[in-house]
Each structure stands twice: as structure tokens, then as C-alpha cells.
Amino acid sequence: ENGLIKKLSKSSAIQGDIVIDVEGKIVTPGLIAPDTEIGIVEIGALSVTRDDESNIYDVGFSIHSAFNPNSTLIPWNRSNGITSAISLPRNTSSPIGGLGSFFLLDSKMNINSNADMVLIGRLGASGSSSRAENLSLMEDILSFGLSLNKKDIASDITIDEIIENSSIASYLDLKARDVKVLYRLFDEDLPLIIKSHRASDILNLISLKKKYDLNLVIMGAQEASLVIDDI
């Protein structure tokens, strides 16, 4: 080691790496599941096992602290080759809202993760509002986030004043943590994952990406082939 003899032995057995006989099974690198509810939803139909939504926060809602490393879904997913995952909250009432986190699925109580690494949203059909309204609301939220600077988020008191003076922030009843996340979106180039399918919606998202210089990821995109040249 480093040009020096580290160990002498009379034994002819050479110490090497551990050999595991997989008995002809296929071996692959660990897979990453990029869109899951692993660790935050156990049984979808049982509300007491769901930690994926909030009635208070919108943009700044984080599921990270609710992650359950003992989830029964973890060993099942690991047996199918998934060793890490990005868990996402259910979309809030806002077209942009909710923070997703990356987790290593090792079932250890000392959770190995990257907290609040992505912001999520949606653009498309909604039972209560039109696409045009959702798109306008999304753009208003982005404009508000882009207008923020470091002094604006210096304290919760300052943030409360910013919210009070903003029609869109007041209308959405944003909280301090919501505003801080919107600041992060632009200051830290936080990835923004928007779920959308229609070709026209995808084009609108591309326009928003260019206008606001977003680190945009379009999820779903069933009609992406129709606008492949623009993508």
C-alpha cells in the first residue's frame, strides 16, 4: 500500500472481495423509482396511512419528515430491484405546490435522503377550473416567486408584509414556508416537475420555462410526440 508491504502471511489463501453466489440470477445496478409515494402512503384507501397531503400549506408542503423507513412497501420494491426512490406528495389545490424528496430504501431508522429536492405541480384538466385559469394562476405564482429577493425572506415578519402586499399571495393564503420555497425555486434553480399530458399544455409549459428560466421537468407528457420538435 503506497509502495510499502503492509502484511506478511504464511498462509497461501489470498484475502479478496466477498464472493456471493447468485445461482444464475440476473444482477443489475439498483434502480431508482422517480415518481412514487413509497414511505408516505401505505394503503391508499385508508386515510390514517396517508401522509401525502396538507390542508394548510401549498407550495411549501414537505413530506420528508413523514417518511416511514419501516414501510411494508420498501422490502417488496427492493426485491424487484428498486433501491432508492423519489417520493412525491399529492398535488395541493395550487397548480404549483408540494416538495418531493429522495430516499435510499435501506430500511434504516437513520434515514439517508435528500430532502425537498424537487417542487411539483400540474397543468391540465381540473374539475373546478379551466386550463386557462390554471395556467394564469401558475404564471402569477412564478412572477411572484421571481420578484422575491434575499431581504424579502429575512424573517417571517418581512414575509408576512410581502404576502400582505401581494394580491396573488394573499388570495392563495400563502404561509412563510410557501414563500421561502418560491424563493428557492429561482435562487437555487430547484427542479420543477409539472405533470401534464396535452400537447398544447406542454407548449405552454415550454413557454413558461423560457420566460422564467425554469429547471423544468414535464412528467407524463402523453402527447409529447406531437410537439417533439419544440421539446
What do these predicted ranges mean?
Residues 61-65, 170, 216-218:
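Short, flexible loop segments at the rims of nucleotide/cofactor-binding pockets, characterized by
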Residues 36-37, 90, 197, 221-224:
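Short, ordered loop/turn segments at secondary-structure junctions
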Residues 25-88:
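Metal-associated gating/positioning segment near the N- to mid-region
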Residues 1-28:
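Histidine-rich, glycine-flanked metal-binding segment
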Residues 43-45, 97-100, 229-231:
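Histidine/acidic-residue-rich catalytic or RNA/ligand-binding cores of hydrolases
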Residues 30-31, 112-114, 226-229:
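Short, charged, surface-exposed secondary-structure boundary motifs
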Residues 203, 222-231:
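Catalytic core of soluble alpha/beta enzymes
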Residues 78-216:
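Polyanionic/metal-chelating signatures
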